């Protein structure tokens, strides 16, 4: 089973050229597109696309390719956002808390926050009873959790994991060329 990357900051960056940005934008929308189609869309051969994909994977730009399920299509899925405040601060206590989250398959995402709350945790569970058990197990009697607040999601307005890749100056140039229209 691959290691999950919950709340782990990245230490390096990858310099993207315009072809990289175009290709990665296409992949973020549909990673199952054939190489020849991706190549046609960005002006590269299928083998050149394959070389770039290999480079993205080896450098960590592409962390993994997965199938994203629609929670609405899977009967009984309950989504919740949990805000968590820790009692005490230390590297060890944060690491222990993060390990708890990494071990829970129902935790979809987690974010280390600045502000009143320490973490935002996204939970997906099969039904409300299971969601309550998961949240209670993770936070109710957890050592070092001072407070948590659960927000149940009625209706997702936008879902996505896409990272914006266009450079701000490119967007500004595009707007200027279109007469300022968005």
Give residue spans per PLM region.
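A compositional/biophysical signature of low hydrophobicity enriched in polar/charged and small residues
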Residues: 1-182
């Amino acid at each position: 089973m691959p290691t999950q990357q919950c709340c782990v900051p990245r230490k390096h960056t990858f310099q993207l050229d315009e072809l990289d940005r175009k290709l990665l934008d296409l992949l973020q929308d549909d990673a199952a597109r054939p190489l020849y189609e991706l190549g046609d869309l960005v002006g590269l051969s299928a083998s050149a696309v394959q070389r770039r994909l290999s480079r993205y994977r080896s450098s960590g730009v592409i962390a993994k390719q997965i199938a994203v399920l629609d929670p609405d299509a899977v009967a009984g899925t309950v989504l919740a956002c949990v805000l968590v405040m820790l009692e005490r601060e230390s590297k060890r206590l944060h690491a222990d808390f993060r390990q708890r989250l990494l071990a829970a398959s129902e935790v979809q995402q987690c974010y280390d926050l600045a502000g009143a709350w320490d973490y935002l945790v996204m939970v997906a569970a099969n039904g409300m009873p299971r969601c309550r058990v998961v949240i209670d197990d993770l936070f109710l009697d957890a050592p070092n959790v001072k407070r948590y607040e659960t927000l149940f999601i009625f209706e997702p307005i936008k879902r996505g994991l896409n990272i914006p890749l266009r450079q701000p100056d490119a967007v500004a140039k595009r707007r200027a060329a279109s007469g300022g229209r968005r």
